[in-house]
Amino acid sequence: MTEKGSFTVVALGLSGAALIAVVFAAVARRTFFGRIECLQRSVEQTRTPSDPRTDLPSQVQALALRLGVPAGSNGRIVQLTQSGEMWLKPGSRPLSFTAQQTIAIPEVAFLWRARLPISVGLPMNVIDYVVGHEAGLESWLLGVLPVVHTADGDTMFRGEAMRYLAELMWNPDALLLNRQLDWRVLNTRTLAVATGEGTRRCEIRLILDGAGDVIRIEADDRPRQIGRLVTNCPWFGRAGDYRTIDGRRIPLQAEVGWLLDDVEFIYWRGRIESWSLKAGAVL
């Protein structure tokens, strides 16, 4: 074979490999974002809530009233957008993010979609979710290359369900409408809320200030994954800068962290950029 012929064969081979890579990337990206849209539809099509609960402790009813939830609420989903910073491990540099989230009101379900610029021109897409009996955390570079994929299992479900419970401060109508939540009054400023059955059972505490706003959340045993190892760790969050939006009293600032050997590690800090509530039946 001549030198020219060898060059042609190599060029064709490289072109073929490039074409295969492009097709693979397109298929992977379409699969990933198609999955996101499927999860989104599932949360948005959550069932229409039944009448507000009448079996709640008076302290929970008082909190709902404080947050602006009317007795005749028929809220179905909450939609919000966020911006902020995340830290992957103690001492790491902060990663800026923007996110949008849909949270179901009458059942434990949500989808969080975030975009983090790892470096110039290299975004990471992250989804965190509970939908039906499925829960997961996934991240993809460019929406093509999977970096993290943790899904299903009772431990995963517990962790994500605990996030739903912690975010009741952004989902106040769920206090009256979500019959999957079990409440206990621990003292005048502490409410415990739980959900799930069997090995999926989980509980957090909502800490109120003197005015009755939720300013802190706590859990003793939220699953934390490091590599392939999962351990239960103390978990906490703080909230503040309450404002009234669409009749609901919502904290615009929040941060979340782990308590590691009695030292706080804040891994998420964010701000609510927009918030809205959708009510009534699915159209």
Predicted stretch roles:
Residues 1-7:
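Short, Lys/Arg-rich N-terminal segment immediately upstream of the first membrane anchor
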Residues 7-24:
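Hydrophobic alpha-helical topogenic segments used for membrane insertion/localization
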Residues 32-79:
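N-terminal leader/targeting segments and the immediate start of mature chains
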Residues 62-65, 69-145:
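N-terminal mature ectodomain segment of secretory-pathway/periplasmic proteins
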Residues 74-81, 105-113, 135, 185-194, ...:
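Short, hydrophobic/aromatic-rich segments at coil-to-beta transitions
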Residues 100-105, 127-129, 179-186, 206, ...:
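Short, exposed beta-strand/loop patches in secreted or surface proteins that constitute
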Residues 138-197, 230:
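Flexible, processing/modification-adjacent segments and terminal tails
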Residues 192-279:
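Gly/Pro-enriched, hydrophobic low-complexity segments
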